[in-house]
């Protein structure tokens, strides 16, 4: 009996020892695995957040558009022909006079910077502007570059009087309706009448043809809408008008001169 009891006690001790062994092993595994999980959690928590990098938005810089707006000019050129004053030009009153024998070798388009012209008029006359410039220089006008005239030129001229002028003599006043059509580019009925009599009549059969050619040449140009120095003006014109790139231009105070041959191709202007 004692022997049996001893055997049972031994078996119990062995079972307890085995149970204790597996219990300790399980705790060890549990303890050793916990830090790994926590580290993983910590690693996930501590991972740096990479926010997407956005390149700074590129804002294109646009250079000021200095081109004259035709629509503004047209709006400013509304004038009732019924209020035209006496705009006829009398040849004998012209201080240069007539030259009907001079040849026509080429043409010069004369453009005028209207704000500069009007400043001179105001300096000279104050508030009492002559009628011929009241429309162009009056309040609320938006004229920039305008056409002074299209002048037939003598290549051998040594003075203004050597160029063709008044080739058909003293002509009658043109119809008001015809002049009104071109006030948008040449703001003055007397200006238009005078340019036709003095210059246009030397190379064109009619005033309509003359003014239409002026308008055609003018509309083919891109023009700045602010005052520029001589060099800046030449540079701007050549940059924005490829047909002028290699041409010699001329300028005088508030005027720009572009020359054309008899086939209406751009050519070099003579230096004088």
UniProtKB/Swiss-Prot annotation:
Keyword line: Endonuclease, Hydrolase, Nuclease, Signal
DNA repair found in the keyword field: no
Any one GO molecular function term: RNA binding
Gene Ontology process terms (BP): RNA catabolic process
Signal peptide: 1-23
InterPro entries according to UniProt: RNase_T2-like, RNase_T2-like_sf, RNase_T2_His_AS_1, RNase_T2_His_AS_2
Active site, renumbered: 148, 195, 199
Cystine connections: none
Keyword Metal-binding assigned: no
Family: Belongs to the RNase T2 family.
Official protein name in the record: Probable ribonuclease HI_0526
